[in-house]
Amino acid sequence: SEAENDLMNKLFTAYNPKVRPAEK
């Protein structure tokens, strides 16, 4: 689901900070 994708994306970026620049 879209919500699950968002959660997984957050977890992924949390462990891979280089994947996406800090948004905040």
UniProtKB/Swiss-Prot annotation:
Topology versus the membrane: Multi-pass membrane protein
Catalytic activity: K(+)(in) = K(+)(out); Na(+)(in) = Na(+)(out)
GO cellular component: postsynaptic membrane
Domain of life: Eukaryota
Subcellular location: Postsynaptic cell membrane; Cell membrane
GO biological process, one term: monoatomic ion transmembrane transport
UniProtKB keywords: Cell membrane, Ion channel, Ion transport, Ligand-gated ion channel, Membrane, Postsynaptic cell membrane, Receptor, Synapse, Transmembrane, Transport
Function recorded in the entry: After binding acetylcholine, the AChR responds by an extensive change in conformation that affects all subunits and leads to opening of an ion-conducting channel across the plasma membrane.
Family affiliation: Belongs to the ligand-gated ion channel (TC 1.A.9) family. Acetylcholine receptor (TC 1.A.9.1) subfamily. Beta-1/CHRNB1 sub-subfamily.
Subunit field text: Pentamer of two alpha chains, and one each of the beta, delta, and gamma chains.
Protein name as catalogued: Acetylcholine receptor subunit beta
Protein's organism: Electrophorus electricus (Electric eel)
Gene encoding the protein: chrnb1
